[in-house]
Amino acid sequence: MSDSPIKYRLIKKEKHTGARLGEIITPHGTFPTPMFMPVGTQATVKTQSPEELKEMGSGIILSNTYHLWLRPGDELIARAGGLHKFMNWDQPILTDSGGFQVYSLADSRNITEEGVTFKNHLNGSKMFLSPEKAISIQNNLGSDIMMSFDECPQFYQPYDYVKKSIERTSRWAERGLKAHRRPHDQGLFGIVQGAGFEDLRRQSAHDLVSMDFPGYSIGGLAVGETHEEMNAVLDFTTQLLPENKPRYLMGVGAPDSLIDGVIRGVDMFDCVLPTRIARNGTCMTSQGRLVVKNAQFAEDFTPLDPECDCYTCKNYTRAYLRHLLKADETFGIRLTSYHNLYFLLNLMKQVRQAIMDDNLLEFREYFVEKYGYNKSGRNF
């Protein structure tokens, strides 16, 4: 697929780790890597405008195939001129395949070789999603980067189940490639699965790499395994993927996990974490996690994070944010969401600089100590 619309350019490798600085070229522009991608589930990053996302340095956003297929419908979005036009976002968009939502949200699902039958979580109607249908929906959405339809088994499933699952995922990937109608302007990634089993990850990666996708995703992590287990899987999985293609770790957004993923050679990450926790007043700051809704901040007239220069921190106090959230004012959620997204995008900017300076391990140590991971066990 040398004529793929998605190209990865390696700029520099970090001397002491597997980290790499690069950029990904897409039909809607180029973004630097490693990059965190804000999630716009329903064709919007909750409470944020496209202008704000650009302002905070978001070079690409993610949207969910499953949700947009159910509402408003992929054909309607195609009639609107595609997802970019529909949501007024002129930069790159990545869409997932819908697979993860089918396994996590839908009821009474039944997986066969053909695809997955499940109950729509909105109205209970029976639906069917196949590899071909997942590709067709994404072709209608017109995202720059698409995902193959895969099964995402739980991390602790038995070996025999996971083996059958990855073999089916490989067959589904092949079917998806054949069904792809727009390879000239949409790049399709294969998704490596295999839970915690090294030989199954190897088999899955081997199958997918032989199909020559423009990029590869690492799926089936951040689904309940420990941080150490995730790192162990990344240690052996990224090495199985080609150096000249992007590597995307799906569903990961905790700050230490982002840094540890980069150390192991990952280029792209996404997660709903920053906006989800912002809605209950939990904020990521340079000093660690802070729940601004707590009573101790009622008369705290300092910025949310004194070291942050985002719009929220430059203009509003902890006391004001607490007041807005306690009063259920949407503006409060907008401000905490803006800050959390900015925090992760800025973290990745610092990580890119650390790769440039060959001191990523020192940066990790400094960040982890300051954030308070060492004091309080894992948190986000």
From Swiss-Prot:
This is Queuine tRNA-ribosyltransferase. Residues 251-257, 275-279 are annotated as: RNA binding. GO terms for molecular function: metal ion binding; tRNA-guanosine(34) queuine transglycosylase activity. Keywords: Glycosyltransferase, Metal-binding, Queuosine biosynthesis, Transferase, tRNA processing, Zinc. Its cofactor is Zn(2+). Substrate binds at residues 96-100, 150, 193, 220. Zn(2+) binds at residues 308, 310, 313, 339. InterPro entries: ArchSynthase1/Queuine_TRR, TGT, TGT-like_sf, tRNA_ribo_trans-like. Pfam families: TGT (PF01702). The keyword Nucleus does not apply. It comes from Streptococcus pneumoniae (strain Hungary19A-6). The active site is at residues 96, 270. Catalyzes the base-exchange of a guanine (G) residue with the queuine precursor 7-aminomethyl-7-deazaguanine (PreQ1) at position 34 (anticodon wobble position) in tRNAs with GU(N) anticodons (tRNA-Asp, -Asn, -His and -Tyr). Catalysis occurs through a double-displacement mechanism. The nucleophile active site attacks the C1' of nucleotide 34 to detach the guanine base from the RNA, forming a covalent enzyme-RNA intermediate. The proton acceptor active site deprotonates the incoming PreQ1, allowing a nucleophilic attack on the C1' of the ribose to form the product. Binds 1 zinc ion per subunit. PANTHER family: QUEUINE TRNA-RIBOSYLTRANSFERASE. Homodimer. Within each dimer, one monomer is responsible for RNA recognition and catalysis, while the other monomer binds to the replacement base PreQ1. It catalyses: 7-aminomethyl-7-carbaguanine + guanosine(34) in tRNA = 7-aminomethyl-7-carbaguanosine(34) in tRNA + guanine. Its EC number is 2.4.2.29. Pathway: tRNA modification; tRNA-queuosine biosynthesis. It is an enzyme of class 2 (transferase).
